[in-house]
Amino acid sequence: MLYLIPTIVGMLLVLPLGRSIVTPFSEKYTSLATERGRIFFGLIVTCIAGAAVSFQTLWISSKVSEGGNFCSSNTVFSCDDVIGNAEYNVDPILGLPWGGIGAATFCILLYLVYSSSKEPNADWVTLHLKLGALATFTGFFVIALLVYYEIQMEKICQYCTTAHIANVAAFIGFFRLVRMNDSNAWNES
């Protein structure tokens, strides 16, 4: 589960304890020396990992629908059983695969956070951060539905769980940046 490593690293960076993790690197990478820079970096890493794992689940669903096996097992951990389930692998409204929805969402989140990190004092940054927080908060309802599906199947998809963790980390990061943007801490160096 290579996707889990950058997801956890990103989550640690957006949390307050991330300050102690980046201290050795802050001289070489000056943007990590500030709270805002560290959270932005953690969010970028998280969104890249979330997009990558979502693209992977989309690929797996394509392979499974063609009759291939990717990660099937006889244990509770079987992403083929979860992702390959034709009834649960698509959203109930539009019929789009969850992996595609996740990939598109994480790419949009990546745009929101990356553009905001490059122009942190632009007028539109507040809107971008609030949209990111809203999108990731909405993701909690999607996660609840997908976990319900996994409980119904009595299987756990490792890739899906990694994407869920990435959403939680992204919400924490966007929420912290929104709060920071509303305070004087936004422009502290």
Language-model regions, residue ranges each:
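Membrane-interfacial helix-loop segments of redox and metal-homeostasis proteins
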Residues: 1-189
